[in-house]
């Protein structure tokens, strides 16, 4: 499952232009990583594309930290 974590952190690094060493699992996209609402939408879209999944608006609202995105993707992959 480490591969999922690495892929998600790479997306965050690319989309938010943040040094990878600052991307911790408990980091909030908005509070800790400085993302705005548009950034979070772009992150969700990038996750959908990277992992070939659909994330509903309701689900997207709950994905507000690095760890929550990892957990969500892992759970989606288990259901495939």
UniProtKB/Swiss-Prot annotation:
List cystine links.
none
Cellular location(s)? Cytoplasm
Where this protein primarily resides, as one coarse class?
cytoplasm
The alphabetical list of record keywords is:
Cytoplasm, Fatty acid biosynthesis, Fatty acid metabolism, Lipid biosynthesis, Lipid metabolism, Phosphopantetheine, Phosphoprotein
Please give one Gene Ontology molecular function term for this protein: acyl carrier activity
Pfam families found in the cross-reference section: PP-binding
In this chain, where does the modification O-(pantetheine 4'-phosphoryl)serine occur? 37
The UniProt transmembrane annotation reads none
Q: Which GO terms describe its cellular component?
A: cytosol; membrane
Which pathway does UniProt place it in?
Lipid metabolism; fatty acid biosynthesis
Q: Give the matching InterPro entries.
A: ACP, ACP-like_sf, PP-bd_ACP, Ppantetheine_attach_site
Q: What does this protein do, in the record's words?
A: Carrier of the growing fatty acid chain in fatty acid biosynthesis.
Q: Which family does it belong to?
A: Belongs to the acyl carrier protein (ACP) family.
Please state what the protein is called. Answer: Acyl carrier protein
This protein's species is Buchnera aphidicola subsp. Acyrthosiphon pisum (strain 5A)
Q: What is the lineage of its organism?
A: Bacteria, Pseudomonadati, Pseudomonadota, Gammaproteobacteria, Enterobacterales
């Amino acid at each position: 499952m480490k591969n999922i974590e690495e892929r998600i952190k790479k997306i965050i690094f690319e989309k938010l232009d943040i040094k990878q060493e600052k991307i911790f699992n408990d980091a909030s996209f908005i509070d800790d990583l400085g993302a705005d609402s548009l950034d979070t939408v772009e992150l969700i879209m990038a996750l959908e594309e990277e992992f070939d999944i659909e994330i509903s608006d309701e689900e997207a609202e709950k994905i507000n930290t690095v760890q929550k995105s990892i957990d969500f993707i892992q759970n989606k992959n288990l259901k495939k």
